[in-house]
């Protein structure tokens, strides 16, 4: 019991992170497999769609899970997400045309998005304060392990000269979903959710089981009382806990902004672009075919090892400073990487330097932004809105929504053109000058009137 139980729960629930890492990573190698390319013959735009559509499903999965997690409890919400992961994996593995593959990716994305929202909240709510960073950080560790296994699975299957080359890796997506579904039966429910639903005796029992040893039972009871009082106070302050209410209350709005901001800044580091198109990056550096897939496997393994080591220190570190230092370090590596890839001809040393920068970037990410983003975003919301707030914040972690950035910029551009830009079609250059209120410009009508007047005076003088 105690710490061993907390760690076990963190790891079992963290299988959702494994799913996220595997499902994201497996397409990195799959889109480079010869048999996959022969089967679907995708154009470059379709490759992007196959990769990104999982994130579209994840967006809606995140939003849906917030409400379900409040209604059903964290455990049942986890099981709900697993069902979609298993069904989606089966559809992808059995796909014989692009539409079926896309539907499978969408369904899997919905399940992964649901789990991405629910599990970190669950991990944060069952963790003693001292160990919260480590327990929630298990999500990133499992994600890194899943990504590494996906890369090595793709590399191993690349030696098979049949559709098994890509069907088997996609089918394996369902396995961790099945394991997590049945493993959820053995997870204790979140004590905070139990208190929220007036199951006080059950909540106290869970808190006592989760504390490190019997000598801390008094501390466990004290934390239980703190949970009860906090939730009672939250209920008294605001009976309504809808999504709309989160935007109405200033304090909740700030938490949502900070939670979403963490995920937005994480994506703006560039990590997801590098991860999804890793084999293409290696190809551009001169490592093609199976060599690129092999390097992807090494890349994933380095990430898993780095994250594992980081978990021993994450509960002792502050949150903000490591993230800021990581941004500065990643900036430097990206500048060097850009310089190397911009070179018209890369020698052996240039190729190795580019690969080294990609690996260094990933090590920095896995030791800072990787684990700390999950921790910070899951712990800043109060119990009353934790699932809903985190669901909206984590929806920002679904990369497809960056298309909305271009939706917004296109719409704003249309408004700017409508209200600020004058029409120039069919006008002389001098008339266009007048549109900008240039007082030195003489309007054509004025010129014409003066010309008519001079002509008239000239005619009259002759007569």
Curated annotation (Swiss-Prot):
Pfam family, one: Sugar_tr
Subcellular localization(s) per the UniProt record: Membrane
GO molecular function: carbohydrate:proton symporter activity
Transmembrane segments: 5-27, 46-66, 83-103, 106-126, 141-161, 168-188, 256-276, 293-313, 323-343, 355-375, 402-422
Protein topology in the membrane: Multi-pass membrane protein
Keywords for the protein's UniProt record, in alphabetical order: Membrane, Transmembrane, Transmembrane helix, Transport
Claim: Acyltransferase is one of the keywords in the record: no
UniProt entry tagged with the keyword Phosphoprotein: no
GO annotations of cellular component type: membrane
Principal location: membrane
InterPro entries for this protein: MFS_dom, MFS_sugar_transport-like, MFS_Sugar_Transporters, MFS_trans_sf, Sugar/inositol_transpt, Sugar_transporter_CS
NCBIfam families in the cross-refs: SP
Protein family (similarity comment): Belongs to the major facilitator superfamily. Sugar transporter (TC 2.A.1.1) family.
Protein function: MFS-type transporter; part of the gene cluster that mediates the biosynthesis of echinulin family alkaloid.
Protein name: MFS-type transporter criB
